[in-house]
């Protein structure tokens, strides 16, 4: 493809390489390092004048360092006269801080949106935003892609009893997501109402729906410490589910997450590779990964060529 340059930040170079290969491109030359005082240094190693630039950087790992690196890369390309800069952010950072849910709480997702715009981003490509209204925090175009088509494909190919399954949301906020998947699989859905006393701790769970003698498939956009999904798995098994799977777009897996998954009764915990999972998979044999590089690559190709990306909302590109 002419007049396109693809750069990778430090957060997930394996995913960036897969996207580049699917597009038939080589990653652009960029050197990122830290000065002795820990300031981030970025050197763009090739001309981007008049080019359509895409920078892949996921909001994971050292999140603050990686976010700062992305902002500097965007700005470096912008002031080097690129025609357009698109930030490809598979897992959007600070997405859970999307509203003022208590006194004096910051809306940090809005701040991140402002920072990306001020740095010079012309367009954002992301996946399964924690709250879709985050798109409204931007005054530039945002394409929020969905892992759902890839999830549906994985379910059909890897769960033999999927026709006798029930799709379960671990909280009321995910009801729209699970009803969409359940409708497309032509199966029932259920949800779990949870009461939180403080962040990352669930006090009580109430199951709404009948899971008896069915394969329960928990679906959520992300899992962090995994307290919610592990409690949910116990709840589903005690309610008569024959097996429990968890399918998540963003597997953050911080703190006690891995030990909790190892001790929980999951058949598998399936995540996409918006976040690197190689180290976690070595620690937990239950973790499986869905590759979404083809979705990002096709979104980049369609954006570069001025085509619609809505096809990707319901199809997995080859």
Swiss-Prot record:
CDD domains: PRTases_typeI. Keywords: ATP-binding, Kinase, Magnesium, Metal-binding, Nucleotide biosynthesis, Nucleotide-binding, Transferase. Disulfide bonds: none annotated. Its cofactor is Mg(2+). Mg(2+) binds at residues 128, 130, 139, 143. It comes from the Eukaryota. The keyword Nucleotide-binding applies. One of its GO terms (biological process) is 5-phosphoribose 1-diphosphate biosynthetic process. GO terms for molecular function: ATP binding; kinase activity; magnesium ion binding; protein homodimerization activity; ribose phosphate diphosphokinase activity. Pfam families: Pribosyl_synth (PF14572), Pribosyltran_N (PF13793). It catalyses: D-ribose 5-phosphate + ATP = 5-phospho-alpha-D-ribose 1-diphosphate + AMP + H(+). ATP binds at residues 96-101, 130. Residues 212-227 are annotated as: Binding of phosphoribosylpyrophosphate. The keyword Isomerase does not apply. Activated by magnesium and inorganic phosphate. Competitively or non-competitively inhibited by ADP, 2,3-bisphosphoglyceride or GDP. Pathway: Metabolic intermediate biosynthesis; 5-phospho-alpha-D-ribose 1-diphosphate biosynthesis; 5-phospho-alpha-D-ribose 1-diphosphate from D-ribose 5-phosphate (route I): step 1/1. Its EC number is 2.7.6.1. InterPro entries: PRib_PP_synth_CS, Pribosyltran_N, PRibTrfase_dom, PRTase-like, Rib-P_diPkinase, Rib-P_diPkinase_bac. Belongs to the ribose-phosphate pyrophosphokinase family. Catalyzes the synthesis of phosphoribosylpyrophosphate (PRPP) that is essential for nucleotide synthesis. Homodimer. The active form is probably a hexamer composed of 3 homodimers. This is Ribose-phosphate pyrophosphokinase 2. The gene is prps2.
């Amino acid at each position: 493809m002419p007049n396109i340059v693809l750069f990778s930040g430090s957060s997930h170079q394996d995913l960036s390489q897969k996207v580049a290969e699917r597009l038939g491109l080589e990653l652009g030359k960029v050197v990122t390092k830290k000065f002795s005082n820990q300031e981030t240094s970025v050197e763009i190693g090739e001309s981007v004048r008049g080019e359509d630039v895409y920078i892949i950087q996921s909001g994971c790992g050292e999140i603050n360092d990686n976010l700062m690196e992305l902002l500097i890369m965007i700005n470096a390309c912008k002031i080097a006269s690129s025609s357009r800069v698109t930030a490809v952010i598979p897992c959007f950072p600070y997405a859970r801080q999307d509203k003022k849910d208590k006194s004096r709480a910051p809306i940090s997702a809005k701040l991140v949106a402002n920072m990306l715009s001020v740095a010079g981003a012309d367009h954002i490509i992301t996946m399964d935003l924690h709250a879709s209204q985050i798109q409204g925090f931007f005054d530039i175009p945002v394409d929020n892609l969905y892992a759902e088509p890839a999830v549906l494909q994985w379910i059909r190919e890897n769960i033999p009893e999927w026709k006798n399954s029930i799709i379960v949301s671990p909280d009321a906020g995910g009801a729209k997501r699970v009803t969409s998947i359940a409708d497309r699989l032509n199966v029932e859905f259920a949800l779990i109402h949870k009461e939180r006393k403080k962040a990352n701790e669930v006090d009580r769970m109430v199951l709404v729906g009948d899971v008896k003698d069915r394969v329960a498939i928990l679906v959520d956009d992300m899992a962090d410490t995994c307290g919610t999904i592990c409690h949910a798995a116990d709840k589903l098994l005690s309610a008569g589910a024959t097996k429990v799977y968890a399918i998540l777009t963003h597997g953050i897996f911080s703190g006690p997450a891995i030990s909790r998954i190892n001790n929980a009764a999951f058949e598998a915990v399936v995540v996409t590779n918006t976040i690197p999972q190689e180290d976690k998979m070595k620690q937990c044999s239950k973790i499986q990964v869905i590759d979404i590089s083809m979705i990002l690559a096709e979104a980049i190709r369609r954006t570069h060529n001025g085509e619609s990306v809505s096809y990707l909302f319901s199809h997995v590109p080859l």
